[in-house]
């Protein structure tokens, strides 16, 4: 997902997306431990999406306090 899509999402939507991404990351970690995971590139995509959503949320939080 592109950073522009994250910025267009509402804060509530970003929180929900963040929860879902973290759940998916945990599920992939379990699959990896069990040897069932075939798509290891998904780990980096999920980590980057989590970082992007946190970046947008923190930027909004900072701007809200300064404004």
Curated annotation (Swiss-Prot):
Keywords: Ribonucleoprotein, Ribosomal protein. CDD domains: Ribosomal_L29_HIP. SUPFAM superfamilies: Ribosomal protein L29 (L29p). Signal peptide: none annotated. GO terms for molecular function: structural constituent of ribosome. GO terms for biological process: translation. One of its GO terms (cellular component) is ribonucleoprotein complex. Belongs to the universal ribosomal protein uL29 family. NCBIfam families: L29. This is Large ribosomal subunit protein uL29.
């Amino acid at each position: 997902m592109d950073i522009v899509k994250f910025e267009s999402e509402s804060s509530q939507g970003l929180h929900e997306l963040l929860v879902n991404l973290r759940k998916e990351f945990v599920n992939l970690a379990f699959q990896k431990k069990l040897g069932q995971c075939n798509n290891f590139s998904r780990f980096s995509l999920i980590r980057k999406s989590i970082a992007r959503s946190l970046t947008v949320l923190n930027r909004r939080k900072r701007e809200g306090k300064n404004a």
